[in-house]
Amino acid sequence: MTPDYQLSAIKATETLIKYGIKTAPVDPLPILKQIPGVFVMTFAEASDMAHMDRKDLLSLYGCDNLDAVTNVYLSDDKKHYVVTYNRLLPSRIVDMALARELGHIVLGHDGTRPEDVRQEEARCFAHHLMCPRPLIHSISASNLRVTEDLVRNIAGFPDCCFSCIRKQPGVTVPAELNCIVRDNFMPYIINFFEYQRHAAKYDGSALADLGTYMDNYIE
């Protein structure tokens, strides 16, 4: 069975629109918390609730789920999800893991399809959510040369995540969806580079720190 990469990309784009994402780096945690029937907690919180040592809990989840895992259960014929994540990992690794779990939920994965197919689709969803193509188009529309370093800095991606994005197969997302996301990001991109030019006058850097920028960002 072949993963449906196009559906994953479309669903990620629709998620950005539905939850009004207009700035980067994209944070999947607030999105997860807004979805009815989804409960999010850390591994530490889960171990406290289960009265189980954290290491034993991680062993129970398995070595493939040390960043985040989602458990699904039915109640009143409705799906409910418990997303548990490891907040001790670097923040952007946690964000990618949560974006992947969000993908499983949005794509309606329920275990009826092969594990490798579901994982590929969820990863594709995460990549399109965290580094949406329309965000890159917004940078290009600002008359700046799009480079990997520039995109990585704005999207907040570690190198390993960015390399995974480049390996994703080409997909087609409806133009009207891409236009909405691009237009949503444009004010942020314009503001971002105005701040960079201003900051460079004082510290001589070519690209000021993203965290400092967010502290000064005004909608």
Q: Across the structure, where does each feature detected by a protein language model lie?
A:
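Active-site hotspot residues in diverse enzymes, especially metal/ion-binding acidic/histidine motifs
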Residues: 1-219
